[in-house]
């Protein structure tokens, strides 16, 4: 486990689970408890780093799930003001009737097509029903 409140180097966390803390009373893990917007976008400021989060999960259509995730990719930035940025982009969602697999099938297919045409990092990309192809794409892109 990695339980510090800072963005680690890859060598520090290889093979470990990184704990994100969304409970303000706890002082363990990367603190994401303040200002995490439910069903929206968040930017959580820390002294030395910033967490940027897209967590839109209440969707009007399966197409909206991919549209939101794709637009968020275009906002990802690397360090620009002396602070490290850690981006988390959720690729999951529900429709009026929870049909997670239907949303995931569409979003995952669109992500694979999109990623094959992009030369960019994706930050932390959270998927429902992930497959080996998506894993390889994200790992490869983030190591550029």
Language model features with spans:
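Catalytic cores of phosphodiester-bond hydrolases, prominently lipid phosphodiesterases
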Residues: 1-144
């Amino acid at each position: 486990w990695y339980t510090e409140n800072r963005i680690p180097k890859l060598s520090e966390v290889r093979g470990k689970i990184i704990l994100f803390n969304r409970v303000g009373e706890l002082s363990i893990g990367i603190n994401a408890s303040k200002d995490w917007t439910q069903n929206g976008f968040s930017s959580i400021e820390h002294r030395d780093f910033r967490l940027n989060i897209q967590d839109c999960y209440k969707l009007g259509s399966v197409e909206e799930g991919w549209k939101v995730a794709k637009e968020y990719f275009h906002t990802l930035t690397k360090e620009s003001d002396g602070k490290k940025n850690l981006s988390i982009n959720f690729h999951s969602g529900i429709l009026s009737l929870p049909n997670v697999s239907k949303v995931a099938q569409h979003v995952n297919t669109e992500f694979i097509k999109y990623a094959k045409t992009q030369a960019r990092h994706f930050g932390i990309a959270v998927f429902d029903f992930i497959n080996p192809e998506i894993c390889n794409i994200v790992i490869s892109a983030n190591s550029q």
